[in-house]
Amino acid sequence: MPSPRCNPLTVSVPELFFSRSFSSRSKIAKASALPLTMIAALFSFYAVANACAQAKPNDKANSSGTQKAHIQTIEETTVDIPMGEKEAPLRLNLSQLMQAYNVPGLSMAVIDHYQIIWAKAYGTIGTGSKTPVTTKTLFQAGSISKPVAATAALALVQKGTLSLDEDVNQKLKTWKVPENEFTKDEKVTLRRLMSHTAGLTVHGFPGYDVDAPLPTLVQVLNGEKPANTAPIRVDFVPGSQERYSGGGVTIEQLMMMDVTGKAFPDLLRESVLQKIGMADSGYEQPLPAARAALTATGTYADGKPVQGRWHIYPEMAAAGLWTTPTDLAKFAIEIAQSRNGKSNKVLSQKTVEEMLTPVRPKEGAALGFFVEEQNPGQFGHDGADEGFQALLTMNWQTGNGAAIMANSDNGVAVADIVMRGVAKEYGWNYKFGGPLSPLLLIAKLRGVQAALDYFTQLKKTGVSEDVMGERSLNELGYRLLYGGRQQDGVTVFRQNVKLYPQSSNVYDSLGEAYANTGEKELAIENYEKSLQMNPKNDNAKERLKKLREPK
């Protein structure tokens, strides 16, 4: 039991079984209360403050006694997972969570009533490093690059240089969107690029090793070597649906460069970063040596560092921003205050109102940001580059928000828990969505069989598929498969096939696992099974083609 002086933080079971919903890329699962039998028995997942073991911050926040108490409570938050009547529960504080998830460093900034009330950093810049992360340490923002880039594009719209609803080919000079049957009646527009409704391919970008040849932007758009992604093309009618596309944002980048004649980092620095006071941020790819010395090292899920410390992203608008949580918080505050008509450093109130309006109602994608129907006023984005993950959320109505960045492919797993702690401590009226599962944490600390046993016992309580089901095991399998535990990944995927034999996807995943472990015939067998159940599974077709190629 915590010492009474700690003011222990407690997050309820339903809240922790449902993660943040400002993540943009999947349908939001509806949160519902868990069975009382589950709450009363073994299988809750909640957070409490632990007075005896806390993560030690690397930066001291200037704050009042009350604020320091809030910070201490969040820092002392512990994940507590009861495992059963005969087994000791799992209890971890923030630093232990970071260690369990192979997160070397984490940095965060908290916003209350439109002000950054504190910013702190934890851990080190890389696995095995003794250099601490500070609030000035630079992290890759991943897809949070997109709303910052969208702000620059909207500034050009305000000037009349660009139009939201004009065919982008009218402004593009160095490259054009190839016309096809899908663009006959509906065109690719800037509004559709920013809202992922333009019908464009290529979800995201893996980046390039620091010593690899870099493609031009046109080579990226055409999928020409040395680009490492497919051609960016329209493959459904623009405006007819929403599908996340970093490829579309790359067209947005080229269009801004074409109409201004400026290098993208210069354009963003002049039009957005300097005006908001984001002095530690930039889109330079690769970074100049002086700024490179200020960065964290990207880290894979298994704790190994990214070769060369990070990847380079010529797709700057989609994935190229280097920044800090404090700078991201400044950005979020400016957007919120512009929406309230209290600031116009970059965009007017009218423009930001349009920026935060979903293009396709109910689907969430606005112009650069994602917004949440269940949380009025909330906007945000998450991000992931090779070895880095980040979260940004803000509410323009309440003035509350936070930015969290980590140098790990598991960063969001820890950031989710921290974000809920912040929301609880500061009394945010925030409805979480999308299932959060403790399975990976259990697998890491108690073994994969313990995680599968936990899953089985939890299902016996009648918990819904949204909370714990096929998707939960599939995610666990991939986390293990690409986190240095391939055989454990195979074990999880085999269990998923056993439990959900009518799903074509479970066979596809098991096929991928076998391919990774070098069991070619088993990989072919499972891909064939998946394709038999779902003839439209293009992934299985492509994988089978590669597996059957003569060496």
PLM features: residue spans?
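Short active-site loop at a secondary-structure junction
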Residues: 99-107, 128-192, 233-247, 316-319, ...
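Short, surface-exposed loop or secondary-structure junction motifs
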Residues: 122-126, 180-386
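Short, conserved catalytic-motif segment at the N-terminal edge
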Residues: 81-139, 177, 227-232, 304-306
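Helix-start (N-cap) detector for alpha-helical repeat units in TPR-like alpha-solenoids
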Residues: 147, 470, 504-505, 538-539
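Short, gly/Ser/Thr-rich active-site loops of penicillin-recognizing serine hydrolases
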Residues: 374-375, 408-473, 483
